[in-house]
Amino acid sequence: MKKKFPEYKGLDLAQVNRDILKIWDKNNTFKRSVRQRNGKGKFIFYEGPPSANGIPGIHHVMARAIKDVVCRYKTQCGYEVKRKAGWDTHGLPVELGVEKALGITKEDIGVKISITDYNNACKKDVMKYTDLWEELTRKMGYWIDMDDPYITYDNRYIETIWWLLKQLYEKGSLYEGY
């Protein structure tokens, strides 16, 4: 015999989500979670950065959910888990989008438009969807420090990568593989 269960029609998951986010905001839950473990073992998480020049999709939600599970697990193990957001700002799609928007080609850079103006247009364009990313981050309850992200076009980031590559080179850890 098939048993019937009544459907609960009063559950508004969107409202539950909003209520939880309000509580987290009011209690500063994310920052308190990190601060309460200050001085314990450290676990630093640098997000493999999304590109802010594209609209976030469901695959980003899935990837971020996995990242968040790892960080929350480490928190439950007693670690002080600092989570650093980042923005990937390099890539051909950014350049092609800016060239199309400006009505120029690669050959026009330095001729019809200065390199500085072109770079500034790319920097502006690549960050155009950060508000959507921040909204998604908040709505999904993904705990990460969005206040001080690393940005791959920032000279500090680039110089750090160069320094790291130099260290690897000097240790003989880099080789040509072709």
Q: Which residue ranges define each predicted feature?
A:
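N-terminal, positively charged nucleic-acid-binding surface of large information/translation enzymes
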Residues: 1-178
